[in-house]
Amino acid sequence: VIALKLPRLTGFCHRLVRPFAAAAAGALLLTGLGFDQSASARARDNLAIATPFEVGDSPAGNYLAALIAGAERDTLAAATFFRETLRYDPRNPELIERAFVASLANGNMPDAFGLADRLLQREANNGLAHLALGIRAIKQHQYPGARNSLSKGGAGRQRDITATLLTAWSYAGAGDYKRAIAQVDRLKDEGFGTFRDFHAALIADLAGNVAEATKRFQAAYNSEKSTLRLVDAYARFQDRHGHRDEAIRAYEAFDQILPRHPIVTAALADLRAGKLLEPLIRTADQGAAEVLYGLGAVGGRQGDELAAIVYLRLSLYLSSKNGLAIITLADIFERLKQYEQAIEVYDSVADDSPLRVNADIQTALLLETLGKTDEAQKRLQDIVNEKPKNEEALTALGNLQRSRKQFVDAAATYTKALELSSKPEKSLWSLYYYRGIAYERQKAWTKAEADFKKALDLFPDQPLVLNYLGYSWVDQGTNLDEAFKMLRRAVELRPTDGYVVDSLGWAHYKLGQYDQAVKELERAIELKS
């Protein structure tokens, strides 16, 4: 619901999904690397780089370290070790390509562009190198050169949409809006329909062609109302052209799909305060960045993480303040367990962005994952002190307090979060559930039971709540019939959750139903293993 849906990534970045580790065995064979020792001696001083990593003197060792880092998507380490290896054999095209890709993924654009130039001297049809240089040309407003680079490279549907839309934005940058829209309309594939209309609308809006922009925005919005980026652009356009009520309606409709998204919340607050919303895209650079952001977000959802990282890095090169692109990139690093890199990316969200608080919350949660619990809790407490009505921050702080067994503080924090809502909503079930756990751990069972029941009122058949309340009743020897119904229902809803099945097994055990207990407990062990 954040970025537009597209067919699976291929094309310019299709080579990126080749696992780095596939060539790891070659690192053990110096002859496989083809090192040119005389060339390396001439190049080493010129290519020396500062690095936080301790690199060795062995080319094979550095190459192996680079491959492992690449396989683990540790982009900083991969870039460092590939560049170090390249010092020993500066004309090796495979090393140049790997160092180039790693530099792109790490966001080191000066290095990446220099390596792209070198790579194309040895491999003239490298699509990703052409893409990178095309984007550099757009940034430098060298639009004919950009189109020349974008016209080269591999084939494939994703390469077609990338090159087509970036070429369109190069025409827009040159002021040739008619040709830009004609270029967008070359995308005939029905799977690209919404993307086509979206970018045609953005270009028409930039050109001041209100009639064309209105038609294209309406077509894109009518086909995809659950995509934040499209809804945001559509609503901003409507507001600037005298349709504030429609802008509010569009945001409120999206809020029903994804409640309380900070971008929507901020936009609605501005609209209700009488402020005029700025357009989503104000320059050709931002338009081209939007293409790359959309493709990167798609790649991240599809599991093509390296391609997604590269597209997002290129997007941020063109438009460094796009908070959604930053958050999407950080989220990918987080999913790859590259927590330090994720924190670094989260920290680059602008202070005035609606996403700043969310980035700070995610950073705090990652600090806890890294074992820096005190620092994490301080960060969350600072956010809550500054933004006492931010439900996400209060929830995160409550969860951290609960994980640290600070149950009294956790319950108080959850209460503050619940007090922010004027009416009960289904989405609040988790807050009642978490507060119920905090009360139960304090031995305040009456309060805990009331919260669990409230959670089930808001979300009947929620398996986690059924499991917790049902097991608690069995443990206390009360409401046994209803408790077993709850536990069995929880297992029906989550039959592969070993912890839920385990609760049912222990409930049988507590009541002396040992045969049934053994059956469920053995199944729980299998599911957990």
Predicted region positions:
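Canonical tetratricopeptide repeat
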Residues: R98-A99, A132, L166, H199, ...
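N-terminal leader/linker segments that initiate helical-solenoid repeat arrays
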Residues: D36-A99, A105-G114, N125, L268-R272, ...
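Residue-level recognition of tetratricopeptide repeat
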Residues: L67, V101, I135, W169, ...
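Position-specific recognition of the canonical hydrophobic site in helix A of tetratricopeptide repeat
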Residues: G70, L104, I138, A172, ...
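TPR alpha-solenoid repeat register
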Residues: G61, L95, A129, A163, ...
